[in-house]
């Protein structure tokens, strides 16, 4: 107790009624926590932001949201700006995480300024000392594919982003489940697109898979919804099961309906909780949130 009292007098920690002591650091960045996200408008983000802000605000922290648009150049500009006035902590959704990132040095500079960095959903494996809260995408790929196999599907295709680690992991999980049954798909049934130019790749994938598969695994609900619409617009729509991840309102929007996995826990709330532990000086480790049917 005496040691905590000394640290509080020196401004290195602060006590908050009902929630313990928090590290302030020499440059507190006031009580601001910055969020670096790829978007704030796609279907996932309103609830994600709500959960993060609600959890942090309950402990007296404000949030500033920066949007990278999933581009390295915008991420670079924003990190340079953040470095000039570091926040208490930084919560980041990584950019094109399956590619080499040119901005890793800026994250390391932030860490040297005693700014904790936590990754959410998409992380950079090179930053081994930065914990992350991600979905168990490998396990999700297995779960979804095993469900499709159990319902009698043998020709299963997929549409994934080639530049996002979550897309690669979902694909790996799918292939793992198929391999266990000896039902590996033809290479042409696994289709890829790039996240900053999705329309071209996704449209080509749809045209190919609709005529070749009985079930199609989509990276997210946006693609799944577009696929369902494309199938229903055909003169003679084939019977295709569409499966996805996220379980958003798009699963039951209008006359469209498809299967989509649900996070077992709200990612935003979990990430904000982990970040608060970091600010309290508690050692945290990376964690994966499972998917459920």
Per-range role (PLM):
Residues 137, 167, 219-221:
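Helix N-cap/beta->alpha junction signal
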Residues 34-36, 157, 217, 243:
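Short, well-ordered beta-strand segments
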Residues 1-30:
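N-terminal helix-turn-helix DNA-binding module of bacterial transcription factors
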Residues 142-182, 285-293:
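An alpha-beta-alpha
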Residues 56-68, 156-158, 175-200:
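Short beta-strand elements in bilobed, periplasmic/extracellular small-molecule ligand-binding domains
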Residues 24, 28-146, 206-211, 215:
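Alpha-helical recognition/docking segments in bacterial nutrient-uptake
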Residues 43-58, 140-143, 165-185, 226, ...:
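Short, solvent-exposed amphipathic alpha-helices that sit
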Residues 186, 203-293:
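Flexible loop/turn connectors
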């Amino acid at each position: 107790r005496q040691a905590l009292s000394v640290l509080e007098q020196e401004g290195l920690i602060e006590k908050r009624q009902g929630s313990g002591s928090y590290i302030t650091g020499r440059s507190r960045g006031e009580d601001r926590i910055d969020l670096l996200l790829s978007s704030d408008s796609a279907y996932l983000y309103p609830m994600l932001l709500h959960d993060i802000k609600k959890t942090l605000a309950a402990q007296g922290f404000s949030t500033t949201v920066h949007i990278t648009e999933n581009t390295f150049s915008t991420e670079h500009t924003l990190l340079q700006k953040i470095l000039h006035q570091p926040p208490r902590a930084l919560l980041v959704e990584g950019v094109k995480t399956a590619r080499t990132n040119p901005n890793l040095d800026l994250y390391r500079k932030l860490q040297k300024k005693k700014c904790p960095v936590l990754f959410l959903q998409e992380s950079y494996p090179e930053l081994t000392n930065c914990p992350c809260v991600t979905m168990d995408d490998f396990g999700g790929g297995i779960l979804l594919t095993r469900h499709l196999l159990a319902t009698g599907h043998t020709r299963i295709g997929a549409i994934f982003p080639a530049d996002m680690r979550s897309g690669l992991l979902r694909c790996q999980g799918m292939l793992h489940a198929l391999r266990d049954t000896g039902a590996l798909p033809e290479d042409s049934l696994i289709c890829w697109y790039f996240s900053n130019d999705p329309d071209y790749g996704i449209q080509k994938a749809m045209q190919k898979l609709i005529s070749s598969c009985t079930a199609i695994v989509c990276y997210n609900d946006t693609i799944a919804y577009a696929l369902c619409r494309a199938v229903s617009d055909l003169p003679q729509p084939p019977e295709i099961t569409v499966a996805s991840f996220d379980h958003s309102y798009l699963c039951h929007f209008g006359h469209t309906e498809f299967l989509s996995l649900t996070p077992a826990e709200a990612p935003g709330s979990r990430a904000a909780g982990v970040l608060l532990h970091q600010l309290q000086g508690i050692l945290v480790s990376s964690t994966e949130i499972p998917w459920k049917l």
